[in-house]
Amino acid sequence: MSMTFRRISFLAAPLALSLLCLGLTGCGLTVRQQAAISKFSATTAALAGQVEDNLVQTRNDVVALRTGMLALDAGTVDLENTSADLDAGLNVDELETRLKAAGALKRFGMMLETLATDTQSGELQAASDQFVASLRQVQGVNLSEAKAEAIGQVISKVGGLWINARRKKALQRVIVETRQPLQTLANLVAHDFNVTNEQWLAVLTATQDEINDSLQSQMEFVAEGKHTNPEDDKSPKWKESEVTLRQDRYQALKLEAAARVKRAELISERMLRSVAGFRGAHEDLFVIIQSNKVTLDKIDGYYTEIDSLIRLSKILAAKERK
């Protein structure tokens, strides 16, 4: 064999391999792996949407019940001029903090989807930057400069002739690098939606307790012939019509509180299962990218949980409109 022939063969080998990697999925992501990533990404975006919607719903529930408590006397409340702190514990700043966690989850799903399917380096880098920026805004998530830079560098290197193989490597690195902060995000969401914790949902249940206990005690003084101010013998006395109206309003408020808390409890149960599904699917994703033989059971289960959560939310919303 001549030197020239050996030289040509040596140069042709990597070229042939490069063409093979570009033309086939074996060196990069298989169709099955891309489908798994797409399903995980879309499901995670849906989870984030449900987190956002139900955080807002809980705040609205509390404001509505507290407004009802104020309305027991007057029948209506001027929300523009009231001095009552109707959203205490669930104010806009608190809500915004929690919505950032949901936003980071959504950005993560978008980044994975872009990384798995988009060949434009600019789009890849933009998706990475948005995710990292979103993640670093979440209180309780410690993303070091080194880890943030590592994620960015992995994404920025995706491109060129070996795009498929590099994309696969990048996905593996990104999943490893984001494991801890993503699990922390999941913990934050689960903590807020756990009715036994003194967090977001606890404000709603505490409001119901206030209606059932302290307000109930006050209602005992609302009776025909009793003074409207128990501490002032000169205050007017309750009339039968006034007592009936106030009692009706109170009973309606108790029923409303029970319905809103029950809704929150049902959502809480499904939400916690969905977050657990996210944890398991996120862990499995790294293994799936490494091997095409691994089953997609956890990702499929994660999708099923989110689908169930969405359907429950729609059913409960339809009941409220009736």
What are these regions (language model features)?
Residues R270-K322:
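Hydrophilic extracytoplasmic domains
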Residues R32-A146:
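N-terminal Sec/ER secretory leader and immediately downstream segment
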Residues L29-R32, A36-T43, G89-K100, A116-E123, ...:
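Non-transmembrane, amphipathic alpha-helical segments
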Residues Q139-A276:
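Extended amphipathic alpha-helical interaction segments
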Residues S2-L15:
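Bacterial N-terminal signal peptides that target proteins for export
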Residues L22-G26:
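C-terminal motif of bacterial Sec signal peptides marking the signal peptidase cleavage site
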